[in-house]
Amino acid sequence: MLLVVDVGNTNTVFGIFENGKNVPLFHKRTVTRKDRTSDELGLFFRGFLREFKIENEAITGGIYSSVVPTLNPILERMFQDWFKIEAIRVHYQMKLPFSISYPRPYEIGADRLVNAAACVIDSPGKFIIIDLGTATTFCVVSEKPEYLGGVIAPGLKVSMDALTRNTSQLPPIVFQSPEKILGDSTIESIQAGFFFGWIGLLEGIIREIKKDKGQDYRVIGTGGLVTVIDAAHPGIFDKIDPLLTLRGLQILHQMNS
């Protein structure tokens, strides 16, 4: 079995794949803690595996993507000590199913490489891949396939937290789809501002990318909030795939083993 781990700034998502399968048996999301030791991580993952009656010895492969460099050596030691394997770290110099047209390819986040890999292998074509995470990222992949570049905007939750943290009278809120554009209270007004503001951001950037690159790019959505956005405002995405990153990790492990 294969253990895949995607370490984001806010959340860490991980899953278990049976050898050769491209859909995870199990997956889970947890808060990224930068103060964890390798043993704490090992205990955490062992507990997760035992929920599903899987012993550590069943894990024969590991791969991780990370945008938190300080956690990389901790993860690698965890894989070594607890699973007796050398995990593969995602980076731009590994085998990828696409080329990179980018002056400084080392700047591309590992999560963006993983998402692009999943899209290219799933159904070759032209893609705009949107990941709604701590940051809102747009990645553009041509049909060659070639990674052309992207757009990075603030993440929704980061922006909401910044607003309430830097204002005296605005309360923290939970992001949800409002019933109407005009709020009847402070909370409803903030919810409307963020929801419709983010819809405008997504649609506006997609429009500008298509104006520059062509209209025949498919828009693929992933990330923690993609199902909320798609359910409340369908039509932005041609396809949503909350498990895109995990499947991309499985693909890159297969290519680099």
Curated annotation (Swiss-Prot):
<comment type="pathway">
    <text>Cofactor biosynthesis; coenzyme A biosynthesis; CoA from (R)-pantothenate: step 1/5.</text>
</comment>
<feature type="active site" description="Proton acceptor">
    <location>
        <position position="111"/>
    </location>
</feature>
<feature type="binding site">
    <location>
        <position position="131"/>
    </location>
    <ligand>
        <name>K(+)</name>
    </ligand>
</feature>
<dbReference type="Pfam" id="PF03309">
    <property type="entry name" value="Pan_kinase"/>
</dbReference>
<dbReference type="GO" id="GO:0005524">
    <property type="term" value="F:ATP binding"/>
</dbReference>
<keyword id="KW-0808">Transferase</keyword>
<keyword id="KW-0479">Metal-binding</keyword>
<dbReference type="InterPro" id="IPR043129">
    <property type="entry name" value="ATPase_NBD"/>
</dbReference>
<dbReference type="GO" id="GO:0015937">
    <property type="term" value="P:coenzyme A biosynthetic process"/>
</dbReference>
<keyword id="KW-0630">Potassium</keyword>
<keyword id="KW-0418">Kinase</keyword>
<keyword id="KW-0067">ATP-binding</keyword>
<dbReference type="GO" id="GO:0004594">
    <property type="term" value="F:pantothenate kinase activity"/>
</dbReference>
<feature type="binding site">
    <location>
        <position position="134"/>
    </location>
    <ligand>
        <name>ATP</name>
    </ligand>
</feature>
<comment type="function">
    <text>Catalyzes the phosphorylation of pantothenate (Pan), the first step in CoA biosynthesis.</text>
</comment>
<dbReference type="GO" id="GO:0046872">
    <property type="term" value="F:metal ion binding"/>
</dbReference>
<comment type="similarity">
    <text>Belongs to the type III pantothenate kinase family.</text>
</comment>
<keyword id="KW-0547">Nucleotide-binding</keyword>
<dbReference type="GO" id="GO:0005737">
    <property type="term" value="C:cytoplasm"/>
</dbReference>
<feature type="binding site">
    <location>
        <begin position="6"/>
        <end position="13"/>
    </location>
    <ligand>
        <name>ATP</name>
    </ligand>
</feature>
<comment type="subunit">
    <text>Homodimer.</text>
</comment>
<dbReference type="InterPro" id="IPR004619">
    <property type="entry name" value="Type_III_PanK"/>
</dbReference>
<feature type="binding site">
    <location>
        <begin position="109"/>
        <end position="112"/>
    </location>
    <ligand>
        <name>substrate</name>
    </ligand>
</feature>
<protein>
    <recommendedName>
        <fullName>Type III pantothenate kinase</fullName>
        <ecNumber>2.7.1.33</ecNumber>
    </recommendedName>
</protein>
<feature type="binding site">
    <location>
        <position position="102"/>
    </location>
    <ligand>
        <name>substrate</name>
    </ligand>
</feature>
<feature type="binding site">
    <location>
        <position position="186"/>
    </location>
    <ligand>
        <name>substrate</name>
    </ligand>
</feature>
<keyword id="KW-0963">Cytoplasm</keyword>
<keyword id="KW-0173">Coenzyme A biosynthesis</keyword>
